[in-house]
Amino acid sequence: MTDARRAFCTITVLAAVVVATAASTAAQRDGADKKPSLSLKATPPAGFAPLRVRAAVDVRGGANDYAEFYCATVQWDWDDGTISENSEDCDPYEAGKSSIKRRYSADHTFRLSGDYRVTFRLKQKDKVIASTTTTLTVRPGAAEGF
């Protein structure tokens, strides 16, 4: 193999490595910047009043250090006139080091029958950054109305 041919092959291989590395880095960056999604489940989804429900939210996908989700205020709207909200005291956010919370849960008792839309919200200050809703049914219980 001539020196010119060897140099051409070396340059071609190096160019392929650079392109592959750039594509891999872009793919990682795209996944890291992706907003996580929320999944809400209420257990049990139906029952008799008074009904105690456990609502759980899983935060799926996206970056583990997604800045908007870090140290967010959590709000549960139970659709019965009750709203629960809490915030945590967190360390300052550091990209690549801080981790978002991946699971939230809360219990609530529904005293009256009806169909309820339970809504979970993640907020930064007064801005809702993500939310999800589920519906549950509470049937009249023996003690309701007495």
Provide a role label for each language-model segment.
Residues 10-20:
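Bacterial N-terminal signal peptides
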Residues 2-3, 23-146:
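Extracellular/lumenal mature domains of secreted and surface-exposed proteins
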